[in-house]
């Protein structure tokens, strides 16, 4: 997570799980290593189901010792529903030894914990799947899932990984400024294939249409350090997340929220600060659980569309600065309004602090505003000052090409940070006031 790396305080894990619950998520897979006991405590209390994953697959003394340590340590956590013994073991997936290793590990798991099933993340190899209780398919396009379920009629299976659509929060066009950043595959076509749009919905529809399969996990909930694939430097982190590495929502967050939550939801993309694209045709999408959506540009209707569950609205319009809005209808009645305005440069900041039960850190989100409206392109420098008794643990902004010093020197009471596409985040420790102002 931004500002702390992998040494995540309990309160910050609580914040991350809260964010997942806001989009309707009810299960996590700890890839590709066991969770901390503190994270599992949170999952127990917050109602998450957990597939806990072993770090190394094998049956030598060291491998078995690691597996045993994980299970003995964590088997009393009610949130855990399965032990994953491995993931994408390409060297052995399609070999007899892969099945034998998986079966031996499964048998050992059952000795230590006879109450839970085992799983493994499979990326195309058939043999290894026969050695576990619940097969995890990593990307159905890499696995002939339907044929496998016919061939093994009693098989229990789930989607252990599906793609969310890689991309940078708030980026919709390739440009020199955004080198190291990228528009989401959901809008550009997966791997450049424009016949596969909104790829996040592809995996969901596959599993929703097959009730004999036990749902799916998306890769990933949050961006993470390293693996900037398909980009390279100056990208410094992955962009696979439904949220960036601060927990700020990408557009795909709202696609899943519309599917997984009951309250009316309507999200428009892109934002309407598209300087340099005046007069060009742009695609506007709507993620929603409303029955129908009518889109307006500067008050003029662009048409009304009926949107089926799991689908999305799509209009081609000429970009004209001003107001982009939409009205969502349920049962013929207007129930939701979404609105984007073209706004000028930021002239103020808005801060909000997460309400958390754990108290080992504070999470403060910062949004850059212009006369009360969010500025989705603002990348201003910000001066942060904290009162005595408050420590700045770290900060971030969700930029996948982030290269700044993210932790001030111990004892610093003032620090300069930078927003990315309208947002930044502070991780603090200790009670007391803070101030944030734009550096002119």
Task: List each language-model region with its residue ranges.
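Active-site-adjacent substrate/metal-binding segments within catalytic domains
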Residues: 1-103, 107-109, 118-119
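Short, hydrophobic beta-strand segments
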Residues: 314-319, 411-432
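Exposed beta-strand face motif in extracellular beta-rich ectodomains
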Residues: 320-324, 432-437
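Substrate-binding clefts and catalytic carboxylate motifs of secreted carbohydrate-active enzymes
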Residues: 81-83, 102-111, 118-119, 129, ...
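Beta-strand-rich structural segments
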Residues: 284-288, 327, 359-376, 436-439
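Aromatic- and acid-rich polysaccharide-binding/catalytic face
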Residues: 122-141
């Amino acid at each position: 997570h931004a500002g702390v790396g992998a040494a995540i305080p309990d309160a910050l894990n609580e914040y991350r799980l809260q964010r997942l619950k806001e989009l309707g998520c009810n299960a996590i897979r700890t890839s590709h290593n066991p969770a901390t006991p503190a994270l599992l405590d949170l999952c127990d209390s917050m109602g998450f189901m957990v597939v806990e994953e072993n770090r190394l697959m094998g049956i030598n003394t060291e491998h078995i010792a690691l597996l045993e340590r994980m299970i003995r340590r964590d088997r009393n956590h009610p949130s855990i529903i399965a032990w994953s013994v491995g993931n994408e073991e390409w060297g052995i997936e399609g070999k007899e030894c892969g099945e034998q290793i998986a079966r031996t590990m499964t048998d050992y798991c059952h000795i230590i914990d006879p109450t839970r099933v085992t799983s493994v993340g499979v990326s195309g190899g058939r043999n290894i799947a026969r050695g576990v209780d619940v097969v995890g398919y990593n990307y159905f396009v890499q696995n002939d899932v339907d044929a496998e379920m016919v061939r093994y009629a009693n098989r229990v299976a789930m989607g252990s990984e599906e793609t969310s659509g890689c991309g940078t929060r708030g980026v919709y066009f390739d440009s020199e400024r955004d080198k190291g950043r990228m528009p989401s595959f959901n809008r550009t076509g997966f791997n450049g294939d424009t016949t596969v749009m909104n790829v996040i919905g592809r995996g969901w529809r596959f599993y929703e249409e097959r009730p004999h399969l036990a749902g799916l996990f998306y890769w990933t909930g949050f961006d993470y350090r390293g693996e900037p694939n398909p980009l390279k430097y100056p990208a410094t982190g992955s962009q696979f997340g439904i949220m960036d590495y601060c927990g700020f929502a990408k557009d795909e967050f709202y696609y899943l929220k519309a599917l997984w939550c009951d309250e009316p939801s309507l999200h428009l993309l892109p934002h309407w600060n598209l300087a340099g694209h005046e007069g060009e045709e742009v695609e506007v999408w709507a993620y929603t659980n409303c029955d129908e959506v009518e889109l307006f540009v500067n008050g003029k209707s662009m048409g009304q569309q009926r949107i089926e569950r799991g689908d999305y609205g799509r209009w081609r319009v000429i970009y004209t600065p001003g107001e982009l809005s939409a009205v969502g209808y349920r049962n013929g009645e207007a129930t939701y309004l979404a609105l984007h305005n073209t706004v000028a440069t930021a002239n103020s900041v808005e801060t909000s602090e997460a309400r958390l039960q754990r108290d080992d850190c504070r999470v403060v989100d910062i949004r850059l505003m212009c006369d009360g409206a969010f500025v989705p392109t603002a990348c201003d420098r910000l001066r942060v000052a904290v009162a005595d008794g408050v420590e700045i643990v770290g900060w971030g902004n969700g930029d996948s090409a982030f290269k700044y010093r993210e932790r001030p020197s111990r004892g610093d009471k003032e620090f300069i940070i930078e927003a990315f596409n309208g947002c930044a985040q502070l991780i603090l420790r200790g009670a007391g006031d803070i101030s944030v102002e734009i550096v002119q």
